[in-house]
């Protein structure tokens, strides 16, 4: 199963398997119809008739939706009735084509049911009305999820963009300078290669406490980084601050880094606790995973930010499980330092040894008394 590099439980975006399965179904049905001995032109005519009937049923459904949308034409469509019609029925050329196809393909067929066209049309409208009243055509949860992901309509996707634009994009470009200033006043505490980033914690259960030491006593608050101020949304000199934490192992300091939770996860957790939001625990878990994946994709296209932070995604086991948040952070710190060393060694390997290069300009002097001409045909 495909999953993100952040955590095994975070899925990748949906692919095109549904359309591939539909293509296989189409092929199988055509083979079955061919084996039944029907002529190809009859198969094509019946296929077009049924396809036009299905689309005509969707047209009836769109008309029913239009009746409701006309009540909101000023608030939802800026007073444009044409926009309301397009939102419910789609392109008018398409609707007219479907009506013509329905009439055209109904005419040449023998009337096996002995029903006139108006009866057939009325029965089609009746079946569509019953489907609407009984909610027989509601989208499946997987279809709703796919549509929302494809159009960036999920709660988590909006939160991820808000977290990036309203926070990370403001503080991450200037983070190295603030860490450098901090090191000058605190004995170069954040000297490791992995300590020059902001580590953002992503618990998939959305449990975000305000005190990290309550989660793990081996995480100890040390200091705050130098403040960053910026004018934001009418607020003059808005203050942004980040905290430096020390990581302990067997009572001894083994590392330090700039650390914090992803604050939008608190909102997801609060929504799941409020009945007015209609947000279940399953919805919360799905949106938390999507939040992580969306933020990862956003940072991947932001070079000025992606090298200044690392996402620490984890899922605490059930009761009785052995999980240490400090050890999880240490693992990411060591991995970051290992990757930095690997990159540095790769850069060093492609650079020539300075001792092998000439230290100054050299003059190449010929032993001949007269200079040679540029032409070679004089010899």
Swiss-Prot record:
Family to which this protein belongs: Belongs to the STING family.
Chain residues that bind 2',3'-cUAMP: 167, 238, 263
Residues bound to 2',3'-cGAMP: 162, 167, 238, 263
Chain positions with Phosphoserine modification: 355, 366
Name under which the protein is recorded: Stimulator of interferon genes protein
Biological classification of the source: Eukaryota, Metazoa, Chordata, Craniata, Vertebrata
Binding site for 3',3'-c-di-GMP: 162, 167, 238-241, 263
Domain comment (free text): In absence of cGAMP, the transmembrane and cytoplasmic regions interact to form an integrated, domain-swapped dimeric assembly. In absence of cyclic nucleotide (c-di-GMP or cGAMP), the protein is autoinhibited by an intramolecular interaction between the cyclic dinucleotide-binding domain (CBD) and the C-terminal tail (CTT). Following cGAMP-binding, the cyclic dinucleotide-binding domain (CBD) is closed, leading to a 180 degrees rotation of the CBD domain relative to the transmembrane domain.
Keyword GTP-binding part of the UniProt annotation: no
Region spans: Cyclic dinucleotide-binding domain (CBD): 153-340
Species per Swiss-Prot/TrEMBL record: Pteronotus parnellii
